[in-house]
Amino acid sequence: MAETATIARPYAEALFRVASESSAGNLGAWSELVSEMGQVAANPDMKAVADDPNVPGDKLAELFLSVLKSPVSDEARRFVQLLVENGRLTVMPDIAEQFHALKNAREGSSDVEITSAFPLEDGQLNDLVAALERKFGRKLYAQVAVDPSLIGGVSVKVGDEVLDTSVRARLAAMQTALTAA
């Protein structure tokens, strides 16, 4: 995995530079397109086609671009052709991840992974994200998951920081304290 991240980095940086300087759209539109490209490239069927040596590069690029729903600029089209020519289309999910990290760094924002024992209502989620934005001092983009094994409460991960206020975490802490005594 480190190898694909290393391969993806220069592509992500080059694409981010092109997206930042492009007059074809804003960085948000580019981010959506790159994210979609990463999802399409991660599809097992697309991986199989990309790994098939009998599929010509121009047909692979054409197929890949035809699956995308977002509008594709000439720069993005050339980028996909470059990936295909270099045999790197399967690295696109890693490129998308690093592109997103570069965008967050530019905007001074971060992704937050919120795991809750129960589904959160919109108001609860908005209040939680607002409180977390105050705590971390930056704009946060929430990705929410439900994990009933938490029993209650939430677990929050921003970068390498984890705030776990779940009942499961409290029970584990109590168990550790009781067995240590």
Swiss-Prot record:
Annotated compartments: Cell inner membrane
Membrane topology, record value: Peripheral membrane protein
PANTHER family reported in the protein's UniProt record: ATP SYNTHASE DELTA CHAIN (PTHR11910)
Quaternary structure and interacting proteins, as annotated: F-type ATPases have 2 components, F(1) - the catalytic core - and F(0) - the membrane proton channel. F(1) has five subunits: alpha(3), beta(3), gamma(1), delta(1), epsilon(1). F(0) has three main subunits: a(1), b(2) and c(10-14). The alpha and beta chains form an alternating ring which encloses part of the gamma chain. F(1) is attached to F(0) by a central stalk formed by the gamma and epsilon chains, while a peripheral stalk is formed by the delta and b chains.
Family membership: Belongs to the ATPase delta chain family.
GO cellular component, one term: plasma membrane
Source domain of life: Bacteria
Function summary: F(1)F(0) ATP synthase produces ATP from ADP in the presence of a proton or sodium gradient. F-type ATPases consist of two structural domains, F(1) containing the extramembraneous catalytic core and F(0) containing the membrane proton channel, linked together by a central stalk and a peripheral stalk. During catalysis, ATP synthesis in the catalytic domain of F(1) is coupled via a rotary mechanism of the central stalk subunits to proton translocation. This protein is part of the stalk that links CF(0) to CF(1). It either transmits conformational changes from CF(0) to CF(1) or is implicated in proton conduction.
Protein name, as recorded: ATP synthase subunit delta
UniProt KW keywords: ATP synthesis, Cell inner membrane, Cell membrane, CF(1), Hydrogen ion transport, Ion transport, Membrane, Transport
NCBIfam families registered for this protein in UniProt: ATP_synt_delta, PRK05758.2-2
UniProt GO MF annotations: proton-transporting ATP synthase activity, rotational mechanism
Source organism of this protein record: Cupriavidus taiwanensis (strain DSM 17343 / BCRC 17206 / CCUG 44338 / CIP 107171 / LMG 19424 / R1)
Gene3D superfamilies: N-terminal domain of the delta subunit of the F1F0-ATP synthase (1.10.520.20)
